[in-house]
């Protein structure tokens, strides 16, 4: 399961950034559920494009973070992901809904 604590483009325009306390709670839940996870970045955020709805939810005062299954070559003719990553994502989402 991959977490991305910051999303946005052109600096802080349309962005969100998960705070340290929320990340600590999330890490505790994942560790207690024995979920394999990692933190990642989107890459060159100044190029724009893509994006998620996390910043919209953050505008309502929600604690937000983007998460998903790691994908190699996203939006290319051949995308690759692992069954183990999908399994860990299911475990992680279940743990989040039960304990976070």
Language model features with spans:
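Active-site-adjacent substrate-binding region
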Residues: 1-78
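His/Asp/Glu-rich mid-to-C-terminal helical/loop segments that flank catalytic regions of hydrolases
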Residues: 69-100
